[in-house]
Amino acid sequence: MQAFIRAHGIILPMNQDHVDTDAIIPQRWLVTVERDGLADGFMGAWRYDEHGQPRPECVLNQPAYQGAAIVLARENYGCGSSREHAVWAHQGYGIRAIVAASYGPIFHENCLKNGLLPVTLPAADVATLMAQALADPGCACEVDLVSQRVIGPDGRAYPFEIDAGRRQLLLEGVDDIDLALARAADIAAFQRRQQQDQPWLA
């Protein structure tokens, strides 16, 4: 997993509540178990019409937002069904962090496990950032995990909280599999003790 220290880039404003995982990565793109190759599916039904042509009104198709690195969203972002592809689609598109007022809980956890930083800010702060992003298309912000701050387009800093353990794993680029492998000896020792002390569980 790629370590996350900070991300600086263009803001992609998703100016509505309850953007669900079916919108983030529609079902027809869920034909793979691979992490790669999902960039085209990111917000696919919003980006393309029934003929596969780009919808010009979609922010993802507007020149100012090309190369965006940070999604700015409102309430309950990533709600709906559990699909890890929703996180992979963000990453495939080039998104490094999300700033939102709240998240679907499963999506939030999947983000942390895959190195996509989900920052939660008060709704009022999100509204301020959203107004700036919409007024100045293509403006940028910075998400700094070391200092736990979002730096808005105008230079204002917005502090955020994150679980200390998850923060450290993100900073080190360590996922749950890496963590388990690092503790393989301890796990094996526990299994041997358990087999000896509780053989009926074997």
From Swiss-Prot:
Keywords linked to the UniProt accession: Amino-acid biosynthesis, Branched-chain amino acid biosynthesis, Leucine biosynthesis, Lyase
Natural source organism: Bordetella pertussis (strain Tohama I / ATCC BAA-589 / NCTC 13251)
InterPro entries associated with the record: 3-IsopropMal_deHydase_ssu, Aconitase/3IPM_dehydase_swvl, AconitaseA/IPMdHydase_ssu_swvl, IPMI_Swivel, LeuD
One annotated GO molecular function: 3-isopropylmalate dehydratase activity
Gene Ontology terms describing biological process: L-leucine biosynthetic process
Record bears the keyword Amino-acid biosynthesis: yes
Catalytic activity: (2R,3S)-3-isopropylmalate = (2S)-2-isopropylmalate
SUBUNIT field: Heterodimer of LeuC and LeuD.
Alphabetized CDD domains for the sequence: IPMI_Swivel
Pathway: Amino-acid biosynthesis; L-leucine biosynthesis; L-leucine from 3-methyl-2-oxobutanoate: step 2/4
UniProt-listed Pfam families: Aconitase_C (PF00694)
A GO cellular component entry from the record: 3-isopropylmalate dehydratase complex
UniProt EC number: 4.2.1.33
Gene name as annotated: leuD1
Lineage: Bacteria, Pseudomonadati, Pseudomonadota, Betaproteobacteria, Burkholderiales
Enzyme class: lyase
Listed name of the protein: 3-isopropylmalate dehydratase small subunit 1
Task of the protein: Catalyzes the isomerization between 2-isopropylmalate and 3-isopropylmalate, via the formation of 2-isopropylmaleate.
Keyword ATP-binding among UniProt keywords: no
Family: Belongs to the LeuD family. LeuD type 1 subfamily.
